[in-house]
């Protein structure tokens, strides 16, 4: 039996009408007991394109951390009391112990609002 090259097979299949190729695929699936499915193609991307794919899911809960009370401690204490509902002594102790977590696991919107109030009072705030 003469050996047929891969190139000859490709040339032969290239000249067949699409209908005959579809029938050939069905015949091969039946003979081999497999199902033809589109192959997942892996595309090599450059580092710039890979960065978005590696991005972690967006964080939904944040800890509001008072990093530094700044020079207006009284204003920051008032803001802490408003945000947390703490008493005067507890709020003062929290402000003086900075860096300290003010609230844990709050939504992004609430965390941003708390940060805004504290920054307006003169504090340095981090969202973690």
UniProtKB/Swiss-Prot annotation:
Concerning InterPro entries, the annotation shows: Ribosomal_bL12, Ribosomal_bL12_C, Ribosomal_bL12_C/ClpS-like, Ribosomal_bL12_oligo, Ribosomal_bL12_oligo_N_sf
GO BP annotations listed: translation
Q: Which Pfam families match?
A: Ribosomal_L12, Ribosomal_L12_N
Q: Name one GO molecular function term.
A: structural constituent of ribosome
Q: Does the keyword Nuclease apply?
A: no
List the keywords (alphabetical): Ribonucleoprotein, Ribosomal protein
Is-annotated flag, keyword Nucleus?
A: no
GO terms under cellular component: cytoplasm; ribonucleoprotein complex; ribosome
Q: Which HAMAP family match?
A: Ribosomal_bL12 (MF_00368)
User: What's this protein's function?
Assistant: Forms part of the ribosomal stalk which helps the ribosome interact with GTP-bound translation factors. Is thus essential for accurate translation.
Q: How does it assemble?
A: Homodimer. Part of the ribosomal stalk of the 50S ribosomal subunit. Forms a multimeric L10(L12)X complex, where L10 forms an elongated spine to which 2 to 4 L12 dimers bind in a sequential fashion. Binds GTP-bound translation factors.
PANTHER family per record: 39S RIBOSOMAL PROTEIN L12 (PTHR45987), LARGE RIBOSOMAL SUBUNIT PROTEIN BL12M (PTHR45987:SF4)
Please state which protein family the record places this protein in: Belongs to the bacterial ribosomal protein bL12 family.
This chain belongs to the protein called Large ribosomal subunit protein bL12
